[in-house]
Amino acid sequence: MNFHHYVYVVLMSEEVLQHLKFLKANPNYQKGKSCLYVGMTGLDPDTRFDKHKAGIKANSYVQKYGLRLAPEFVADLRQPMSYEDARYLEVDVAIRLKEKGYAVWQA
């Protein structure tokens, strides 16, 4: 099995909350909590973040509002994993963070 995928979280500026689509996706957002993007990649997360910021296969919210990687939200998931595990955990992490009141975008 090929273990080179990662789940990563990006901290975004609260300015992303100006987007109605983002707000509608986060009806349980608790004001003051972080705005986050959760993704998965076959690249090193630092490289993937740099590509987002450069506009290469970028999520528009991350490109415009991404501040930094936020590994503290996935501290237990820093090791490479299979594509299938990363795909599952990307969704799982996003759901768990939303349940805790964070504003989360996961595509």
Where are each of the predicted segments found?
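Aromatic/basic micro-patches that form nucleic-acid/chromatin recognition or nuclease catalytic surfaces
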Residues: 43-46, 50-107
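GIY-YIG nuclease catalytic motif and its immediate N-terminal context
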Residues: 1-50, 84-93
